[in-house]
C-alpha cells in the first residue's frame, strides 16, 4: 500500500473515504483567515471532523496571525495537526539549506503541490507519484475593465465554468492593479 497525501477540498470528493489519505495539506490562507470562501472552508472542516476514521496528519501553516483554532474546527482525535514553517530565509546558502532540511523555513512556495512535495521530503520519502496535479498556475490570468489582475481558477471538483475574479493582495481586499 502507498501513502497518500491530499490537499485543499479533496475531503469533499466522494472518493475521499476510499482513498483515506494519511496526510492532508492546507496551505492557502483561506483555510485560516476570513475569506469569501468561508462557507466552503467550514464545510471542509465539518467533513474532515466527521469522516476521518483513520489516523491522519493534517499539515497547516505555522503562520497564523488571527490564531485560527484548528483543534476547535477539527475536534477529531484521529486528526493530528502538524504545523509547517513558511518563513523564507534569504542569506547564507548553507544556513538556508539547513533550515529547509530541518523544516524551519521554506522556499516561498506558490502552490499547495509544492508544499506537499516539501512535506513529503521532510517525512523522508524518496519517490513521489503525483496524480491529478494541475500545473497551469498562469492559465486563466487576465485583466478586467478596472485594470485589476484576475484569474479564472479551475479545479477538478468544480462543475461550473470558471469566471475570472480579481486577485487580492491582502485582507481586507485590495486588488492587484
Over which residues does each language-model region extend?
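Metal-ion/cofactor- or nucleotide/acyl-coenzyme-handling active-site neighborhoods
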Residues: 1-177
Amino acid at each position: 500500500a502507498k501513502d497518500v497525501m491530499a490537499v485543499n477540498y479533496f475531503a469533499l470528493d466522494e472518493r475521499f473515504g476510499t482513498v483515506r489519505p494519511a496526510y492532508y495539506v492546507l496551505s492557502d490562507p483561506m483555510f485560516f483567515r476570513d475569506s469569501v470562501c468561508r462557507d466552503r472552508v467550514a464545510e471542509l472542516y465539518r467533513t474532515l471532523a466527521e469522516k476521518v476514521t483513520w489516523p491522519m496528519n493534517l499539515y497547516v501553516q505555522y503562520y497564523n496571525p488571527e490564531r485560527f483554532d484548528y483543534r476547535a474546527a477539527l475536534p477529531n482525535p484521529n486528526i493530528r495537526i502538524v504545523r509547517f514553517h513558511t518563513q523564507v530565509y534569504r542569506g547564507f546558502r548553507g544556513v538556508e539549506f539547513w533550515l529547509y532540511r530541518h523544516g524551519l523555513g521554506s522556499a516561498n512556495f506558490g502552490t499547495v503541490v509544492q508544499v506537499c512535495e516539501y512535506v513529503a521530503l521532510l517525512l523522508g520519502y524518496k519517490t513521489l507519484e503525483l496524480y491529478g496535479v494541475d500545473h497551469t498556475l498562469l492559465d486563466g490570468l487576465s485583466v478586467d475593465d478596472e485594470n485589476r489582475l484576475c484569474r479564472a481558477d479551475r479545479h477538478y471538483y468544480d462543475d461550473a465554468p470558471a469566471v475570472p475574479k480579481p486577485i487580492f493582495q491582502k485582507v481586507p481586499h485590495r486588488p492587484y492593479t
